[in-house]
């Protein structure tokens, strides 16, 4: 059976299918970024490819120094997921960086996002939406809000969770660090990318803590790690 489509439609479909392929090499990644308004550097592309091929099956840590473009690297990763129609995406960051994240993703990668905060969240609940996080939109929220709404985040089938300034959660191995432990539990079963310029500051246990957020079984329990 022959399908009658125009040449233009054929090109569009081919382009669409190419973008949906997994980013297992540079060619597929290039397809999802062909419209991006950003000059990528080799190390940013390499970091993104590492995240896709990470030996830590549940995610990776992007730990470039300040100014080397970790946000761009995250944008590359988010763009690829978006192009594959894996659009349940969550960015957790400090409250003062929410608008910056939203602006950069839109301006540089044409990725629309929703900043989830108390007012918009409550309005959604009042409108009968059972879980405002459960949407095929890129959602951005603060660390504090993620802690407060952890139960909703946990119930959402995220394709990817990005945690910016992740060193703020580095003491997750301490039970008294409630924000870190609550967020860790909420995203435990999801693929995660942690972003920090300082994965290790005072103790090797901080690195243990960050890695445990991605996968509890990489280093084993804290007693064995010590």
Regions found by a protein language model. Give the residues of each.
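P-loop (Walker A) phosphate-binding loop of NTP-binding proteins
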Residues: 65, 94, 198
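Hydrophobic residues on the short alpha-helix immediately C-terminal to a glycine-rich phosphate/catalytic loop
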Residues: 65, 77-81, 101, 210
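Conserved P-loop NTPase motor "coupling/switch" region that bridges the ATPase
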Residues: 110, 135, 160, 178-226
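Short, amphipathic alpha-helical segments that act as regulatory/interfacial helices
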Residues: 52, 102, 208-212
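SF2 helicase/translocase NTPase motor core
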Residues: 2-49, 71-72, 82-179, 222, ...
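Pre-Walker A (Motif I) flank of P-loop NTPase domains
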Residues: 55-60, 87, 137, 190-191
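Active-site catalytic microenvironments for nucleophilic, acid-base chemistry
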Residues: 53-54, 80-84, 213, 217
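Walker A/P-loop
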Residues: 57-77, 166
């Amino acid at each position: 059976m022959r399908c009658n489509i125009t040449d233009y439609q054929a090109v569009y479909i081919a382009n669409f299918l190419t973008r949906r392929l997994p980013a297992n090499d540079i060619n597929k990644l290039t397809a999802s970024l062909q419209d991006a308004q950003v000059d990528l550097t080799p190390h940013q592309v390499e970091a993104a490819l590492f995240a896709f091929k990470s030996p830590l099956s549940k995610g990776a840590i992007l730990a470039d120094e300040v100014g080397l473009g970790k946000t761009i690297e995250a944008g590359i990763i988010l763009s690829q997921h978006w192009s594959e129609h894996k659009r349940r995406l969550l960015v957790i960051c400090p409250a003062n960086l929410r608008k910056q994240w939203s602006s950069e993703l839109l301006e540089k990668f044409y990725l629309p996002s929703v900043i989830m905060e108390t007012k918009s969240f409550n309005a959604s609940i009042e409108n009968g939406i059972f879980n405002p996080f459960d949407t095929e939109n890129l959602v951005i929220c603060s660390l504090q809000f993620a802690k407060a709404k952890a139960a909703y985040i946990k119930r959402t089938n995220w394709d990817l969770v990005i945690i910016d300034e992740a060193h703020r959660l580095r003491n997750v191995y301490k039970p008294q660090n409630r924000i870190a432990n609550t967020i860790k539990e909420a995203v435990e079963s999801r693929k995660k990318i942690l972003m920090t310029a300082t994965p290790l500051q005072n103790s090797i246990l901080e690195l243990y803590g960050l890695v445990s957020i991605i996968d509890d079984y990489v280093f084993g329990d804290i007693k064995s790690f010590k």
